């Protein structure tokens, strides 16, 4: 009797495993059919399917407010927020490089040297210490 109960339990387990496998197979095939139909349609040029990045670009007009041709003559902005000013005195061109506070950089460096401070590359300092 125990054998029949055990075999009955095994049969139910096998049947439920087969049924689960069949259900998984049906789910997989339904997804496969879905993808095959989408691939078969082949109309990807629909506006809802095309992103802005994939759309063709028209002519890009230059922004005249930020174009380099509209900068004030005599001044040019540099990367580290300094301004380079070119002036003409007695036929001689002088260049002053000012930081954003209006202090000449040469004078600032001279003041540091007077105080005994100088700029040293970090690698040179690490080689000296290490």
Curated annotation (Swiss-Prot):
Protein role: Involved in the regulation of plant growth.
Name assigned to this protein: Vascular-related unknown protein 3
PANTHER family associated with the record: VASCULAR-RELATED UNKNOWN PROTEIN 1-RELATED, VASCULAR-RELATED UNKNOWN PROTEIN 3
Stretch forming the signal peptide: none
Ranges where the record places region Disordered: 45-81
Highest taxon in the source lineage: Eukaryota
Other noteworthy facts: Plants overexpressing VUP3 exhibit severe dwarfism.
Biological process according to GO: multidimensional cell growth; xylem development
Upper classification of the organism: Eukaryota, Viridiplantae, Streptophyta, Embryophyta, Tracheophyta
Disulfide topology: none
């Amino acid at each position: 009797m125990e054998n029949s109960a055990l075999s009955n339990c095994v049969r139910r387990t096998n049947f439920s495993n087969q049924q689960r496998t069949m259900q998984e197979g049906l789910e997989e095939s339904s997804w496969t059919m879905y993808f095959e139909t989408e691939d078969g349609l082949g109309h990807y040029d629909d506006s809802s399917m095309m992103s802005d990045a994939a759309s063709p670009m028209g002519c890009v007009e230059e922004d005249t407010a930020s174009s380099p041709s509209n900068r004030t003559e005599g001044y040019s902005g540099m990367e580290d927020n300094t301004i380079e000013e070119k002036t003409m005195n007695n036929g001689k061109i002088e260049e002053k490089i000012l930081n954003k506070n209006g202090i000449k950089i040469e004078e600032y460096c001279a003041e540091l040297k007077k105080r005994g401070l100088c700029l040293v590359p970090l690698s040179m300092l690490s080689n000296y210490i290490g």
